[in-house]
Design a protein with these regions (language model features):
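Conserved catalytic motifs of ABC-family nucleotide-binding domains
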Residues: 86-95
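Short beta-strand immediately N-terminal to the Walker A/P-loop
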Residues: 32-33, 81
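ABC-type ATPase nucleotide-binding domains, specifically the catalytic core motifs of the NBD
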Residues: 95-110, 119
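The feature captures the beta-strand-to-loop junction immediately N-terminal to the Walker
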Residues: 35-37
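Helix-to-loop junction immediately C-terminal to a conserved catalytic motif
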Residues: 50
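Conserved ABC transporter NBD signature motif
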Residues: 58-66, 75
């Protein structure tokens, strides 16, 4: 079971689709890197996952429970987020993707990372 799962999430503001039909699963111990151009919805996606805003449609679950049914205060004690500021992490995309491995002294899965770079 996924720790955090987004199923067909959309977020619309004033008839403008900010996030459209996004689905993803994050399992315990996994790292997730979200990259994209300015205005592509990265911050909105993090706000949705952090329960700071609610999706227009779709379902977000945490430990198998619909996020809409979980007390926001207790959820926020378990889940946090950090927005990247260019001056704080002024590194290449490669260095930012490797950052979680570096700080834990772990060997990165280079096959997976190469796959991610090929998507860019």
């Amino acid at each position: 079971m996924a720790l955090l799962e987004l199923s067909n999430i959309s977020y619309v503001v004033k008839e403008k689709s900010i996030i459209r039909d996004v689905s993803l699963s994050v399992h315990d111990g996994e790292y997730l890197t979200i990259v994209g151009p300015s205005g592509s919805g990265k911050s909105t996606l993090l706000k949705l996952c952090s329960d700071l805003i609610s999706p227009t449609s779709g379902v977000i679950t945490y430990n198998g429970r619909d996020l809409a049914t979980i007390d926001p205060e207790s959820y926020r004690k378990e889940v946090g987020y950090c927005f990247q500021r260019p001056y704080l992490f002024a590194k290449t995309v490669r260095r930012n993707i490797l950052f979680p491995y570096d700080i834990r002294g772990m060997e990165p899965d280079m096959i997976r990372i190469k796959y991610l770079f090929d998507l860019l």
